[in-house]
Amino acid sequence: LCKECAKKLSPFFSERRRSTVEQIREQLDYREANKDRVAGFNTTRTLGGDTKVLLDEDAQCFIVTSSSRWRDANPDVMDFSQVTGCDSEVRETRTEIYRENSEGHRESYDPPRYDIDYDVYLTIHVNSPYFDEITFKVNDSRIEERYSVEFREAERQANEIREALTSLRETVRENVAAAKAPKVAVTCPFCGATTMPDANGRCEFCGGAIGL
């Protein structure tokens, strides 16, 4: 795989070494087609900080990107229906603190002492042929104290993204289920005819709005 082709693969794809040439070609075709979806993407809502989750609620899809010129970056456009779950995680970075002894040498405390910083990560689990999850750091800079204002804000953003994607996914699935449900004949309150409401919930005879 040449460097130029490697750059075109999804940033969320991590199975390159275990993929066949044909699988790589399929993904490159998908990434090329994705450019059209990016071009037509209309942001209706923005969540997150430096790494943003952009929602196109009209087209029922979303993008995760940290690029300010995200259209040029060709981020993967995912459908709300592809989301299978979301979960957040707090990761700790422990850096040992040392002291200087009487001889001027650095040594550990007994017991050892650590400076602990925190990062909040969100993982969006997705149903895609090319990757299973999208993981990114929610906070823009490392958090020094747990339960600080910065920590709570990162947790709030993670929860907001999770709740938004989960809710939108359920709405899409409910709409699909409703569309597949068998239609039931009803009596039109306007003309009295027995009718099967059309896709807009209107009587097929008089056009009256009778709902679905």
What are these regions (language model features)?
Residues 4-16, 206-212:
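Short Cys/His-rich micro-motifs in 6-15 aa windows
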Residues 4, 13-21, 170-181:
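Netrin-like (NTR/C345C) domain of secreted extracellular proteins
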